[in-house]
Regions:
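Substrate/ligand-engaging "lid" and interaction regions
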Residues: 1-224
Length: 224
């Protein structure tokens, strides 16, 4: 947050580096939301709109404030939701437009962030199951000398831990749209670079053929 000047300046230093090619996001689908169900702004979003880039606090406001400082870049949402890049782009453009109304930015900035040849929002599809933290893995890590690895049960009866355990199969399909170049992402295990249509079809296949129908079919058996 911009209330911590040292962190804010460090973030700006990183974001304005010409070598920066991409910024990835895993903030859940709710992290892109600017409005409540009734269409009104969340209070922190309303404050960000009124206060402008120099006092941004929310994730989307901070991102747009950083975009005001820099060069071509790809903003890559890796959250597990359909058309994630479009959701991120909509939030960025909404915040930018609201700042324009307040006089914090001008038309040139809106044109800049709207041009996907300059600021891209690649779509991605992630398919990897991460079940609740395993006590066995926690024990194994502690046996290796890593301290305080045991899962914690929250007040909402969810499990959290300092580690993540997951199934071995994994698929990450990324739209190959990077205005300032990119790392060799395809060298990663289970990572595939593709066009937007392929990413969208992969997402559709995951939720209509490979994953949800199987869960829906086997769920009643578990109840029985």
């Amino acid at each position: 947050q911009s209330s911590d000047l040292a962190q804010w300046n460090r973030l700006k230093e990183i974001f304005t580096s010409k070598s920066l090619q991409m910024v990835s996001f895993t903030i859940t689908e709710k992290g892109y939301a600017l409005q409540k169900a009734d269409g009104t702004w969340f209070p922190f979003v309303e404050a960000d709109i009124k206060n402008g880039p120099d006092k941004a606090t929310g994730a989307m406001a901070v991102l747009v404030a950083m975009l005001y400082e820099r060069y071509p870049i790809a903003l890559v949402s890796m959250d597990n939701c359909s058309k994630n890049g479009a959701k991120l782009r909509e939030s960025v453009l909404t915040m930018a437009e609201e700042w324009k109304k307040q006089g914090f930015v001008d038309d040139d900035f809106i044109t800049y962030v709207s041009d996907e040849k300059v600021v891209a929002f690649p779509w991605t599809m992630i398919d990897k199951i991460t079940p609740r933290p395993s006590e066995q893995i926690a024990d194994d890590l502690e046996a290796l000398g890593v301290e305080k690895m045991q899962p914690v049960i929250t007040g909402k009866k969810t499990y959290i831990a300092p580690f993540v355990n997951a199934e071995k199969p994994q698929y990450l399909v990324i739209e190959d749209s990077f205005p300032n170049g990119r790392p060799a992402l395809e060298k990663g295990f289970g990572v595939y670079m593709a066009d937007r249509n392929t990413v969208n079809l992969s997402e559709r296949m995951k939720v209509t053929v490979c994953l949800n129908p199987v869960h829906s079919a086997t769920g009643p058996l578990g109840v029985v």
